[in-house]
């Protein structure tokens, strides 16, 4: 039965859903990597698709930008459609010195300036972490494909245009790999509902060094990450 934000039918989604922020990126993934593709939802142009990858059922759906948006879609996928595994796929801005453009960053944990997980956990700090089995599978797949990978803590920011740029130096000191806007929220929802979640990111820019990928390199890096994510999805 459709939810307020997803007009798919029961059984339309696979147990594993790959989730980019951009719904057009979800469309690109479905058309480029999946076979026997069916579009299953389009409310608010937040497109979702289900198909097969190497013969196994996989879904892909956009989640929008920021923790409030992604939390709605992840909650409804798990609670209403029985999704078991959420794999966020996106980009991040690096802050640590050893993280380079085109690296793949896998979020073992996710710090945040958002209060959503404290609200969820009665005012206490909640350690927003990835599912270990998903994490291990993704790391092994990246290494098998010789994709440069960094594993560790990311930071999910509420503000894209931060008024406190000095925070990035503090992040670097504390070993944060890079900054996104969703991982901590997705990990919190998954934990709350008993599902598994992972975040896999490409490094599109380095915040402290002012480096940015060209559009061509950005696409290549995304495709490399997608192969890691898809192999993870069918090997868990």
UniProtKB/Swiss-Prot annotation:
Chain positions of site Important for catalytic activity: 218
Residue positions binding phosphate: 21, 25, 44, 88-91
Binding site for a purine D-ribonucleoside: 5, 180-182, 204-205
EC number(s) reported in the record: 2.4.2.1
Single GO molecular function: purine-nucleoside phosphorylase activity
Reaction(s) this enzyme catalyzes, per UniProt: a purine D-ribonucleoside + phosphate = a purine nucleobase + alpha-D-ribose 1-phosphate; a purine 2'-deoxy-D-ribonucleoside + phosphate = a purine nucleobase + 2-deoxy-alpha-D-ribose 1-phosphate
PROSITE patterns (alphabetical): PNP_UDP_1
Entry GO terms, CC: cytosol
SUPFAM superfamilies, per database record: Purine and uridine phosphorylases
Positions of the catalytic residues: 205 (proton donor)
GO biological process, one term: purine nucleoside catabolic process
Keyword Glycosyltransferase on entry: yes
Highest taxon in the source lineage: Bacteria
Pfam families: PNP_UDP_1
The keyword Signal appears for this protein: no
Keyword vocabulary terms for this entry: Glycosyltransferase, Transferase
Protein family membership: Belongs to the PNP/UDP phosphorylase family.
HAMAP family assigned to the protein according to its UniProt record, in alphabetical order: Pur_nucleosid_phosp
Subunit structure: Homohexamer; trimer of homodimers.
Function: Catalyzes the reversible phosphorolytic breakdown of the N-glycosidic bond in the beta-(deoxy)ribonucleoside molecules, with the formation of the corresponding free purine bases and pentose-1-phosphate.
Protein name: Purine nucleoside phosphorylase DeoD-type 2
Organism in which the protein naturally occurs: Vibrio cholerae serotype O1 (strain ATCC 39315 / El Tor Inaba N16961)
